Amino acid sequence: MGQTITTPLSLTLDHWSEVRARAHNQGVEVRKKKWITLCEAEWVMMNVGWPREGTFSLDNISQVEKKIFAPGPYGHPDQVPYITTWRSLATDPPSWVRPFLPPPKPPTPLPQPLSPQPSAPLTSSLYPVLPKSDPPKPPVLPPDPSSPLIDLLTEEPPPYPGGHGPPPSGPRTPTASPIASRLRERRENPAEESQALPLREGPNNRPQYWPFSASDLYNWKSHNPPFSQDPVALTNLIESILVTHQPTWDDCQQLLQALLTGEERQRVLLEARKQVPGEDGRPTQLPNVIDETFPLTRPNWDFATPAGREHLRLYRQLLLAGLRGAARRPTNLAQVKQVVQGKEETPAAFLERLKEAYRMYTPYDPEDPGQAASVILSFIYQSSPDIRNKLQRLEGLQGFTLSDLLKEAEKIYNKRETPEEREERLWQRQEERDKKRHKEMTKVLATVVAQNRDKDREESKLGDQRKIPLGKDQCAYCKEKGHWVRDCPKRPRKKPANSTLLNLGD
């Protein structure tokens, strides 16, 4: 009584430090909370037979991997480190995992050849009998270091020789069906358990090489944005490929050739060589150490040996560091200032565009608390005029965080009038203006009418005075009595015209 049942999930949680160390050795990070969520919920909801308590069955792990590595928007790149660590615990189990491993399946017997080894030519056949010739033995990859890169259109992996005996004349059954793509497509024989990695264990316990296919590179390039547009997304994709596929040096060059431009590749390689560690673990400046650890030409690394695999592991880590370093852009604040809030854009959408501009045109992280002041100023001064004016008048603005300003901006935005309300307000304002103008015009007209009325009154008084009748002996010109107007001394008189008298004698 009181005993608890140990499950694969609880077992990994009890040995969490070792699980994290295992993931760290593979170049990834895992977190306990997400580990539990994926095992108990996310992978169960994929409907591939994953139990809530977890499992170390490679069949279940492979089914989950097919969902995670699905191309395009159907995949789950964020879950790659977790399923990779699960597979690592199942394929290379520590001592505390071995008792919980499922029993191994009996090996599938190879089918008998359809035709026995002929000692003499067949007497009857549907096809003409061709003379047999011993085929040349395929070389073990990688070939001569001076040879060119592997052909991208190669779909069949280069096999490793299984022995020195002659090959059977009948059709042979491969030990593992070749992959059509590096995205873990469904295999024809689900009973055979194999790991879809470029370097995996072959029939003779030797690593077997699986090159990239043209369809893989095409899908990765077409379903992801360019590095110049979204370096974070493409870096995450390449990281998942490096972790899960464990590519060789040639594979890495093909990957960079397909996904990056020439200028971008140069930046990535330059940043990666800056991160080559020295003996003290810090980046070194010694050219020989840099060329040995991160070579620019094909190295003589044999992935079949532990030393070669260690070189490749360090090379992939440095390549990933170079991608992250090249993703940092030069500062271009002019592009950030061009991001302004639209007339009908919400403050939240504008803030997201502003942060994206900081990520794209500056090396700064807008989520970094040290950059909060710059983001706040850009958010205030690049908002729409009505929001900007009200945000600037807030009391204690220096104590506001970006979240507080976003809330205030949302309040201002939500209180905005609708187009109908704005039209009604403008109509009322125009009506009030017209009423005021009409009132002023009425006053002006009343003043003019009053002035005209007073003038008419004065003129009427003067007219009445001029119509007073004159006296009998009163002058009509000077209004004095004693004479008439024709005899008025004050009246100007016309001078008589000078007449020239002509003498009759003249």
From Swiss-Prot:
Ranges annotated as CCHC-type zinc finger: 473-490
Post-translational modification: RNA-binding phosphoprotein p12 is phosphorylated on serine residues.
Short sequence motif PTAP/PSAP motif: positions: 118-121
Record keyword Protein biosynthesis present: no
Residues covalently joined to lipid (N-myristoyl glycine): G2
GO biological process terms, semicolon-separated: viral budding via host ESCRT complex
Region listing for Disordered, in residue ranges: 97-208, 417-440, 486-506
Top-level taxon in the UniProt lineage: Viruses
LYPX(n)L motif, short sequence motif: residues: 126-130
Composition skew (Basic and acidic residues), residue ranges: 417-434
Extent of Pro residues compositional bias: 100-119, 136-146, 156-171
Keyword annotations of the record: Capsid protein, Host cell membrane, Host cytoplasm, Host endosome, Host membrane, Host-virus interaction, Lipoprotein, Membrane, Metal-binding, Myristate, Phosphoprotein, RNA-binding, Viral budding, Viral budding via the host ESCRT complexes, Viral matrix protein, Viral nucleoprotein, Viral release from host cell, Virion, Zinc, Zinc-finger
Motif PPXY motif: chain residues: 157-160
Disulfide-linked positions: none
Chain intervals with Low complexity compositional bias: 120-132
Entry's Gene Ontology cellular component terms: host cell late endosome membrane; host cell plasma membrane; host multivesicular body; membrane; viral nucleocapsid
Site label Cleavage, positions: Y127, P128, L197, P198, L445, A446
Chain intervals with Polar residues compositional bias: 497-506
Keyword Mitochondrion: no
Molecular function in Gene Ontology: RNA binding; structural constituent of virion; zinc ion binding
InterPro entries cross-referenced by the UniProt entry: G_retro_matrix, G_retro_matrix_sf, Gag_p12, Gag_P30, Retrov_capsid_N, Retroviral_Gag-Pol_poly, Retrovr_matrix, Znf_CCHC
Matches recorded under PANTHER family: GAG_P30 DOMAIN-CONTAINING PROTEIN
Name of the protein in question: Gag polyprotein
Native source species: Feline leukemia virus
Gene encoding the protein: gag
